[in-house]
Amino acid sequence: MDRRTFLKGTSLAAAGSLLPLSGALALGATNDDTVSTGKERVKSVEELMTRKTREVIDQGLRYLAHRQISEGNKRGAFGTAGYAAGVAVTALAGLAFLCNGSTPVSGPYQKNIKLCTEFILKNVRSSGYISENDTTRRFSNMYGHGYAMLYLSQVYGMSKQRELEKKLAKAIKMTCEIQNNLGGWRYQPVARDADLSITICQVMALRAAHSAGFQVSDEVRTKTIEYVDKCHKKDGSFQYTEKGGRISLALTAAGVVSYYSAGIYEGPKIEASLKWIYNHRPGKATRQQVSPMNYYYAHYYAVQAMWHAQLQHPEYWNTWYPLIRDELIDSKRSRDGTWPDSRVGPEFGTAMSCIILQIPFNYVPVFSP
């Protein structure tokens, strides 16, 4: 299924002049794959993926594989306590393995993907909420639920497991039911207030589920676009909630990817936001715009926004990826080959960095333009 047909019908009506595009690259781009847009040429995988980049990715993935627990109550997780023991980090690590080309049935990280899936499925509650029982961790909420649902959707598309299908269907149903009246989601699984940082996690997961063959109602899609519109500002940036709040690279990139996930790829709002993101590229953004606390979260969505924009603005992608690649490798990486995160931990930082660095491989459908 062409991911750019997702939410095509009612989403276009809700978004007015915003129009969808065709895809840019086939999944699993080879070293010789290059796209010409009639403007600047989109750089090939070989041009972007230096030898050093591949080496540090491999080192990061080996670290994650080593950290994964293979037996006991936390089998499949990446720690016995803290965020590493939760579904969010497990899902992100699983996505990092998938981004390398491994699947549930093949590849060097096949076993690790199976363990990630096993752990997440074990934590799907009867309501469909995906969360381990320890609710003291901040990621044991709708962040984790969204990342877990996104990961399971990708695995389901590759394996069609029956247990996975049943539990994922429950998670999708619950997510749709707790969307609030403004069209967004919040930290806990109740339909009260909303914010953009949580909404992106849910709408991207729903898009992935839809592409894997699950039903997502037009009403949910339309309401999501309406909520994202309320968070958009005239200068192209996005604010934390419809009422206001902080503005940052993380939120602006999340807003753009929310539009993409809702089937919207063009229009004045997206153009303004892409320009805003590009103007705050690595080396240009201030500490206020990209705080250390949200660094990986910001660049996880920013690299997707630039990657999806390559047909309209190949110069954005051609500039952005080398900048974030070099920053992650030369400035953010520890001597042991991991990416530290003072709040969540190196498992999280390493998983996020490996996803970001592997985007040009184009192996995972939900990340594909």
At which residue positions do the language-model features occur?
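An alpha-helical repeat/solenoid feature that recognizes helix-turn-helix modules
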Residues: D33-Q59, A77-N112, R125-K173, E177-T222, ...
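Predominantly the C-terminal beta-signal and adjacent terminal strand-loop region
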Residues: I329-R333
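Active-site-surrounding "flap" and adjacent substrate/cofactor-binding loops of secreted or lumenal enzymes
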Residues: Q110, T117-F119
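N-terminal export signals
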Residues: T5-L27
